[in-house]
């Protein structure tokens, strides 16, 4: 009986999805980290940023991983120019006049911390069938600048 219980315990632990935190360092020393990389649909993950250039506004979102050299799109929540919701964020310490109050300012040292909701579908795209990630990219004021792009792939479990 003990062997059977031990076998059941080993099997149940081995079948549990592994969900570790992950981080990535960008070319300019910025660090992006996420609390979990394997989640269930509708889960919320914590995303931290450190050492980001406070003169460059960024978007933080859950997006389809793009082809090399392209901006991440589509993204859950779209490009958040309304400053509302938990699917995407516009982070900028020096937003244009029309965006004052819509952006979240960097904390000292180019830091930020946000909760991002993960959805299986981004529009009609199924993130169980294509690769999706927590992403950071330069905001629309530098829309062609790919030097700030960072991606941490996220798996949506069944």
Task: Label every model-predicted segment.
Residues 22-158:
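Extended, solvent-exposed regions of the mature portions of secreted/cell-surface glycoproteins
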Residues 13-20:
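C-terminal segment of classical bacterial N-terminal signal peptides
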Residues 4-13:
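Sec-dependent N-terminal signal peptides
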């Amino acid at each position: 009986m003990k062997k059977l219980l031990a076998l059941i315990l080993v099997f149940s632990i081995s079948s549990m999805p592994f969900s570790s935190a992950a981080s990535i360092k960008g070319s300019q020393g910025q660090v992006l980290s996420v609390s979990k990389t394997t989640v269930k649909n509708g889960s919320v993950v914590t995303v931290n940023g450190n050492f980001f250039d406070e003169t460059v506004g960024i978007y933080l979102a859950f997006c389809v991983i793009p082809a090399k050299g392209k901006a991440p799109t589509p993204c859950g929540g779209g490009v958040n120019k309304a400053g509302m919701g938990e699917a995407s964020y516009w982070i900028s310490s020096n937003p244009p006049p029309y965006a004052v109050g819509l952006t979240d300012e960097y904390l000292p040292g180019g830091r930020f911390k946000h909760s991002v909701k993960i959805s299986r579908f981004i529009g009609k795209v199924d993130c169980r069938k294509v690769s999706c990630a927590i992403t950071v990219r330069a905001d629309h004021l530098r829309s062609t600048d790919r030097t700030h792009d960072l991606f941490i792939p996220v798996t949506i479990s069944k």
